[in-house]
Regions:
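Phosphate-group recognition and catalysis centered on beta-loop-alpha active-site segments
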Residues: 1-242
Length: 242
């Protein structure tokens, strides 16, 4: 049955990519959790979607130009709702340790945010952190940048990956460069992808928030969906599991 991935945690009800959002994702029973990783000025892995802190904190500036200490001084919760004042941008290590502490045993999708900025050492640092211990959850890496995924597979040939795309052009480009494992298409390309995916590879579709789109993915028995509302998706999925 279709797996439910909490997109940036429970992004629809909690400030995205924060520990509060990931706690909620685990609490509601998400099958998977998706997050985004950038590198700070001092080479630390931080979990945030945008290249800048402007949208989701009370600060300004590009991640690559800020130190971890500067980023940790920011409020990453108040923009969403004042209840979450004081939430911080977490490091990737903090999220991994939290998920382990909470007993999460699903899949963690780490999106490598190299489609706009090429972070030197990002892949190596993620794999090194992953290798520090045995985690109770599976890890899959995804990226819109196929070159990043090629680099990752050279460093760890057995690591599971997924190719993100939102255009036919990049789907074909990435597919030609990579071993065929899984596709992560934009919802708007679902019909095209279903025809194009002649090898019947697993599809993890983003971002699926409307009931009608969730129901269609369940009916098609899509491998997984990324949603901002995992609790709602899990409730809808129950109708297909009876």
């Amino acid at each position: 049955m279709t797996k439910i991935f909490a997109h940036r945690g429970s992004k629809g009800t909690h400030p995205e990519n924060t520990l509060a959002s990931f706690k909620e994702a685990v609490s509601v029973g998400s099958d998977g959790i998706e997050l985004d990783v950038h590198l700070t000025k001092d080479g630390q892995l931080v979990v945030i979607h945008d290249e800048t802190v402007d949208r989701t904190t009370n600060g300004t500036g590009e991640i690559r130009n800020l130190t971890l200490a500067e980023i940790k001084a920011l409020d990453a919760g108040s923009w969403f709702y004042n209840t979450y004042a004081g939430e911080k941008i977490p490091t990737l290590e903090e999220v991994l340790l939290l998920l382990k502490e909470l007993g999460f045993n699903g899949q963690l999708n780490i999106e490598l945010k190299t489609d706009i900025i090429q972070y030197e050492g990002l892949v190596e640092k993620c794999l090194a952190l992953q290798g520090t211990q045995t985690w109770p959850f599976a890890i899959v890496y995804s990226s819109f940048n196929p070159y990043t995924l090629v680099e990752l597979k050279k460093l760890n040939p057995t690591q599971e990956i997924g190719l993100l795309f939102e255009s036919v052009e990049w789907a074909n480009k990435g597919d030609a460069m990579l071993e065929k494992e899984a596709y992560h298409p934009d919802l708007k390309l679902l019909d095209w992808t279903l025809e194009w995916n002649t090898n019947q590879l697993p599809l993890r579709v983003w971002t699926v928030n409307e009931d009608k789109d969730m129901n269609r993915c369940f009916e098609l028995q899509i491998e997984a969906i990324f949603t901002d509302y995992p609790e709602k998706a899990l409730q809808l999925k129950e109708n297909y599991e009876r």
